[in-house]
């Protein structure tokens, strides 16, 4: 019994030693994250950027998204000799002190945060460069980060990342997911009016809009949406020559293979991996909506086959990991 207890304590101490809370400077206070996996300059390091809204470092978002996609990625990569940093976005969760208003943000501001993390991670680990993995909207942050200052970045992993301007994607999502009802066409008409205003860089009037749309496009987030709408992911990926892995599931209800193919067309040398039967959370799921969304709430459902293999293969095989040895910025 004592031997088992000693082994348990040792295992716990080793686990604790492999994960550490870390900080990077934010605009008003610290950005916070968790560095996990093997230590030392020989281990590649992946910075994970979560998706839209209030997504946390694990990739979860209250109330319905508990798939823990980023945590599962970190654990799987650690088992393959790859370290990772999972971070909370400015103003949210453990990074709540970084800014007073998390909705007052731009892609460029998120890119500034990513650069701050890259500097911290290179100094702490001794790694010559850091990979950036962006999930969903986080992939746009990864592209913005690479386009503003590529130094110190090994390459990009774009996981379920939009490949078309956000306006086109939102229109497609609403058309695909709104059920047939008397409210369907009025909602689509209202969406078109809102997006047309925001795409023109102007605030949208929500006075006669249904509560669902009014919540999504509330005045406090409209400046950020205007900023997002002005970016074309295909042009962004074409502007960088860093190694890129594009990961896309075929049963993703939010981002589709058309997005992945648009990114790949803009960068023909990028590595595109199609994951059959895999949804937006990188879990195996059917295309049927109800069953697909059930995987969003299940942290015990493992990542789909091929996800970790694709990422680890890119990170461990690509020469960018060892060749991009520019000085820390």
Per-region residue spans from a language model:
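Accessory cap/linker subdomain of secreted extracellular hydrolases
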Residues: 157-227, 231-234
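Primarily recognizes the serine-hydrolase "nucleophile elbow" in alpha/beta-hydrolase
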Residues: 120-177
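Catalytic active-site module of serine/aspartate enzymes centered on a nucleophile-bearing elbow/loop
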Residues: 281, 287-329
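Alpha/beta-hydrolase active-site loop
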Residues: 102-123
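N-terminal cap/lid segment of alpha/beta-hydrolase-fold proteins
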Residues: 18-41
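Conserved alpha/beta-hydrolase
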Residues: 68-96
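Short, surface-exposed "cap/lid" segments of acyl-processing enzymes
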Residues: 41, 46-77
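Short beta-strand/loop motif that positions the catalytic acidic residue
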Residues: 240, 246-248
């Amino acid at each position: 019994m004592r031997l088992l207890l000693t082994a348990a304590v040792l295992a716990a101490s080793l686990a604790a030693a492999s994960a550490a809370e870390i900080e990077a400077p934010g605009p008003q206070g610290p950005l916070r994250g968790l560095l996990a996996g093997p230590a030392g300059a020989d281990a590649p390091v992946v910075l994970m950027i979560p998706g839209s809204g209030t997504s946390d470092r694990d990739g979860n978002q209250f109330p319905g998204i508990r798939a823990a996609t980023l945590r599962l990625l970190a654990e799987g990569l650690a088992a393959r000799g790859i370290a990772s940093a999972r971070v909370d976005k400015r103003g949210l969760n453990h990074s709540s002190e970084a800014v007073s208003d998390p909705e007052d943000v731009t892609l460029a501001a998120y890119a500034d945060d990513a650069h701050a993390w890259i500097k911290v991670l290179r100094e702490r680990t001794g790694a010559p460069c850091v990979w950036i993995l962006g999930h969903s909207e986080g992939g746009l942050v990864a592209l913005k980060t690479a386009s503003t200052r590529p130094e110190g970045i090994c390459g990009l992993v774009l996981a379920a990342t939009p490949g078309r301007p956000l306006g086109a994607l939102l229109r497609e999502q609403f058309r695909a997911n709104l059920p047939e009802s008397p409210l369907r066409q009025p909602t689509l008409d209202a969406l078109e009016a809102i997006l047309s205003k925001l795409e023109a860089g102007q605030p949208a009037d929500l006075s006669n809009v249904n509560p669902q749309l009014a919540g999504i496009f509330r005045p406090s987030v409209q400046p950020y949406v205007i900023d997002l709408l002005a970016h074309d992911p295909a042009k962004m990926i074409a502007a960088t020559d860093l190694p890129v892995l594009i990961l896309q599931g075929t049963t993703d209800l939010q981002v589709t293979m058309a997005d992945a193919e648009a990114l790949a067309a803009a960068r023909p040398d990028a590595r595109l991996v199609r994951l059959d039967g895999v949804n937006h959370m990188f879990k195996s799921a059917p295309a049927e909506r109800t069953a697909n969304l059930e995987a969003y709430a299940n942290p015990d459902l493992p990542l789909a086959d091929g996800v970790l293999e694709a990422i680890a293969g890119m990170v461990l095989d690509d020469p960018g990991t060892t060749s991009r040895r520019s000085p820390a910025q």
